[in-house]
Amino acid sequence: MAKPRRTGKKERKNIPVGVAHIQATFNNTIVTFTDQKGNVVSWATSGGAGFKGSRKSTPFAAQVAAENAARKAQENGMRTVGVLVKGPGSGREAAMRAIHNAGFKISYIRDITPIPHNGCRPPKRRRV
């Protein structure tokens, strides 16, 4: 029988300045904290926060996900962040507000939503 592999405790990195990436789609919100080079420090999603189905896309679910990711980033010493927002979802503002309320100093906010220059054909309109 093979011996169980010994894994050391997760080391704490001290990263005072980072970037918060908020990807808000129509179905989910993903919040990722990285260092300035783009290496991931912490992340959370509204689906991973316990919300399923259509509740994942609510602003409250985005707020909970942002709080979870922010808590993990603060454990690694992060204090100042720039915010990059991508996507059309409803959780954009709520996630930004949650990051600010978690005690981070926000240095900049940029919208990096990709805009097609007449690229792919969009999905057909829903008839409900």
UniProtKB/Swiss-Prot annotation:
- Is the keyword Ubl conjugation in the record? no
Q: In which domain of life is the source organism classified?
A: Bacteria
RNA-binding as UniProt keyword = yes
Task: Give the record's keywords alphabetically.
Answer: Ribonucleoprotein, Ribosomal protein, RNA-binding, rRNA-binding
Which Pfam families would you find in this protein's record? Ribosomal_S11 (PF00411)
This protein's GO cellular component annotations are:
ribonucleoprotein complex; ribosome
Q: What's an example Gene Ontology biological process for this entry?
A: translation
Molecular function per GO = rRNA binding; structural constituent of ribosome
Quaternary structure (record): Part of the 30S ribosomal subunit. Interacts with proteins S7 and S18. Binds to IF-3.
Q: Name the job this protein performs.
A: Located on the platform of the 30S subunit, it bridges several disparate RNA helices of the 16S rRNA. Forms part of the Shine-Dalgarno cleft in the 70S ribosome.
Looking up PANTHER family in the UniProt record yields: 40S RIBOSOMAL PROTEIN S14/30S RIBOSOMAL PROTEIN S11
The family this protein is said to belong to? Belongs to the universal ribosomal protein uS11 family.
Name by which UniProt lists this protein: Small ribosomal subunit protein uS11
Which species does this protein come from? Solidesulfovibrio magneticus (strain ATCC 700980 / DSM 13731 / RS-1) (Desulfovibrio magneticus)
Q: What is the lineage of its organism?
A: Bacteria, Pseudomonadati, Thermodesulfobacteriota, Desulfovibrionia, Desulfovibrionales
